[in-house]
From Swiss-Prot:
Encoding gene per record: hisS
Protein family membership: Belongs to the class-II aminoacyl-tRNA synthetase family.
PROSITE patterns attached to this UniProt entry: AA_TRNA_LIGASE_II
Pfam short name (any one): HGTP_anticodon
PANTHER family per UniProt: HISTIDINE--TRNA LIGASE, MITOCHONDRIAL-RELATED (PTHR43707:SF1), HISTIDYL-TRNA SYNTHETASE (PTHR43707)
Keyword Nuclease: no
Organism: Erwinia tasmaniensis (strain DSM 17950 / CFBP 7177 / CIP 109463 / NCPPB 4357 / Et1/99)
Keywords for this protein: Aminoacyl-tRNA synthetase, ATP-binding, Cytoplasm, Ligase, Nucleotide-binding, Protein biosynthesis
Protein's name according to its UniProt entry: Histidine--tRNA ligase
EC category name: ligase
Any one GO biological process: histidyl-tRNA aminoacylation
EC numbers for this chain: 6.1.1.21
């Protein structure tokens, strides 16, 4: 017997019970994005490898260890996208969306990183991201954070996430800080692990977010990034904090927060949670004013964030037991008797014409009324429409609320209006 082919490790199937939750989560996220004036953009899953090397940075874990890279038949190096910002910027430059314009874009889809699979972290994962181009003040940074806070309230997880915030300054300020940090690390090189030694000269700021407790203890005496900020970055950060204070959004300034991608400057932030075990990041982003120019476009201020949907869904399921998944079926049509099935199908089509948003399923499995009602319950229907020979003859139907058992007989011509009222369509 041939061996069964299974999904690749770290790349998961999501079955109907899962996708009902995902669809409801995504619906909430998209509604909020729309309320802030964002438009969707869709980019390819595969991009030229140099895009990510130039954008993310060659001396990063993502580029060095985690990208799925291959040569096509023409010998061109291609990569499955590990994140969305670089592709969004590439598309904006290529199609003339960015220069001297304000753009608010969002995207959603699968990303790929070769990591050790664990809860909430997979080799194929899904992100939703938002990017704003053409605005350089701290107000838009604050509004993006305020928008994410609105997400948490809508999803019922606001009490289980907290905001960490930092400014990593301008490129020049970071260069000055980099020199001071390297000098400090050189004085304590015997304490550094191999990973930190490797990064000390190539990307020393990444030492700041080392998970090694000995390194974290050492960094208590290291130079503080905040002491090296340029005046403009300091003023920008103060403006951001002032706006968040005014909006009542709590935050903690974490001067070791630098983010893992090289393109950030000034504002960086993370929403974190400890409700899934060890503290994990739910949503992260920041400002990347130099990336558009770095990828060949005109200098354009930009700020954005991305969020992993797997971890978000896990968090919603863990802390919000009242969260309702997307309903697959609102109304289930039950029919019994000679010639009734055809009448039920035609009734269902008329109801779909009248109520395009209605989710309606007609029973095709036969069986007595008891079995058909059991199927309606299995599909999670809220309402059953019952047709028998008498109802067809009299152009009537029975409508039954499956939550409380109440039922009534009414004319078929009144069914659409009654369902619209009951389901608030």
């Amino acid at each position: 017997m041939a061996k069964n082919i299974q999904a690749i490790r770290g790349m998961n199937d999501y079955l109907p019970a899962d996708t009902a939750v995902w669809q409801r989560v995504e619906q909430i996220l998209k509604q909020v994005l729309s309320s802030y004036g964002f438009s969707e953009i869709r980019m390819p899953i595969v991009e030229q490898t140099p895009l990510f090397k130039r954008a993310i940075g060659e001396v990063t874990d993502v580029v060095e260890k985690e990208m799925y890279t291959f040569d096509d038949r023409n010998g061109e190096s291609l990569t499955l996208r590990p994140e969305g910002t670089a592709g969004c910027v590439r598309a904006g430059i290529e199609h003339g969306l960015l220069y001297n314009q304000e753009q608010r874009l969002w995207y959603i889809g699968p990303m790929f990183r070769y990591e050790r699979p664990q809860k909430g972290r997979y080799r194929q994962f899904h992100q939703i991201g938002a990017e704003v181009f053409g605005l350089q003040g701290p107000d838009i940074d604050a509004e993006l954070i305020m928008m994410t806070a609105r997400w948490w309230k809508a999803l019922g997880i606001a009490d289980h996430v907290s905001l960490e915030l930092n400014s990593i300054g301008s490129l020049e300020a970071r260069a000055n800080y980099r020199n001071a940090l390297v000098a400090f690390l050189e004085q304590h090189i015997e304490v550094l692990d191999e990973d930190c030694k490797r990064r000390m000269y190539s990307n020393p700021l990444r030492v700041l977010d080392s998970k090694n407790p000995d390194i974290q203890a050492l960094l208590n005496d290291a130079p503080a990034l905040g002491d090296y900020l340029d005046d403009e970055s300091r003023e920008h950060f103060a403006g951001l904090c002032h706006q968040l204070d005014a909006a009542g959004i709590a935050y903690r300034v974490n001067q070791r927060l630098v983010r893992g991608l090289d393109y950030y400057n000034r504002t960086v932030f993370e929403w974190v949670t400890d409700s899934l075990g060890a503290q994990g990041t739910v949503c992260a982003g920041g400002r990347y004013d130099g990336l558009v120019e770095q990828l060949g476009g005109r200098a354009t201020p930009a700020v954005g964030f991305a969020m992993g949907l797997e971890r978000l869904v896990l968090l919603v399921q863990a802390v919000n037991p009242e969260f309702e998944p997307m309903r697959v079926v609102d109304v289930y049509v039950i029919a019994s008797g000679d010639g009734v099935q055809s009448a039920a199908m035609l009734l269902a089509e008329r109801l779909r014409d009248a109520l395009p948003e209605l989710k309606l399923m007609t029973n095709f499995g036969g069986g007595n009324f008891k079995k058909q009602f059991a199927r309606a319950d299995k599909w999670g229907a809220r309402i059953a429409l019952v047709l028998g020979e008498d109802e067809v003859a009299n152009k009537q139907l029975v409508i039954k609320d499956l939550r409380n058992g109440e039922q009534q007989t009414l004319a078929q011509s009144d069914a659409a209006a009654t369902l619209a009222a009951l389901l608030q369509l």
